[in-house]
Swiss-Prot record:
NCBIfam families: bL25_bact_ctc, PRK05618.1-2, PRK05618.3-3. One of its GO terms (cellular component) is cytosolic large ribosomal subunit. Belongs to the bacterial ribosomal protein bL25 family. CTC subfamily. This is Large ribosomal subunit protein bL25. One of its GO terms (biological process) is translation. This is one of the proteins that binds to the 5S RNA in the ribosome where it forms part of the central protuberance. The keyword Ribosomal protein applies. Gene3D superfamilies: Ribosomal protein L25, beta domain, Ribosomal Protein L25, Chain P. The gene is rplY. Pfam families: Ribosomal_L25p (PF01386), Ribosomal_TL5_C (PF14693). InterPro entries: Rbsml_bL25/Gln-tRNA_synth_N, Ribosomal_bL25/Gln-tRNA_synth, Ribosomal_bL25_b-dom, Ribosomal_bL25_C, Ribosomal_bL25_long, Ribosomal_L25_dom, Ribosomal_uL5_bac-type. SUPFAM superfamilies: Ribosomal protein L25-like (SSF50715).
Amino acid sequence: MAENVLSAQKRTEQGKGPARRLRQQGLIPAVVYGGKREPTHVALDPATLLKAIETPHKFNTLLELQVDGASKHVLFKDYTVDPVTRKLLHADFLEVSLDQPVRVEVPVATVGRAAGVAEGGILSVATHEVVVEALPNKIPVRIEVDVTELKIGRSLHVSELKPPEGCKFKFQTDYVVVFVAVPEKEEVAAPVAAAVPGAAPAEGAAPAAGAAAPAGGAAPAAGAAPAKGGEAKGGDKAKK
C-alpha cells in the first residue's frame, strides 16, 4: 500500500470557537488517536486530505502525517461533514506502527456468477464488511468471494473464505457472508365463475339490487287487506 504524505500543524485550543476560526482560515480541526500518548489535536487543509484519501482503501488509507516536523503513520478513520453544504468539518486518525497488526473492516466483493442463480435463485450478500487483522501496509482493498460453485439454498460462512496473504479474519461467530436464496412461489388465485344472465340466485342468496322479490311471502300491495287470519297493522283485530 503506497503512503500519502499529509501536513498538519499542532493546535492548543479546542472547542467550538477555535474550531470556527480555523474553518474561517480554510482549515479544519482533526484528532490523532492511538499510540501510547494522549490524543494529538491538529489542524489541516481539508482539500489536501480529500485528495490524499482518493484511494481504493478509503477509510483504511495509510498516511504519513507530518506535524511540525515530526511524522507518524496514521489511518484515516472518521470524519464529519456539514449537513447542508457537505463540506468537511472534522477528521479523526488512528496512529499505527508498521510492524504491529491492526484490525479493520474491509468490504466484501463477490466474484463470478453463482450456479444457484442459473437455477432461478437470488444471490444475496449477508455481510458487506469483514474484520481483518493485518499490518497497516498490508490491508487489502477488498475481500473477493468466489461464488461460482454456490448452489441454490447454499451459503458461504466467513470461516470458508480464504484470506489474502498476510491477513487473518477475526470473528467470534461463524457468520454467513453470502447465500443463494430460494425464490418465493407466487400464489395463483382460483378463477371465479362468471354469473350467467337470468340464472336464479343460489339458495339463501339475496336477490340482486333492483330485482323483484320472490313470489312466496311477498309483501301485500299498498292499501290491500291482510291475509286471512292476519292482523291489520296499527289497528284492532279483524272482526269475526
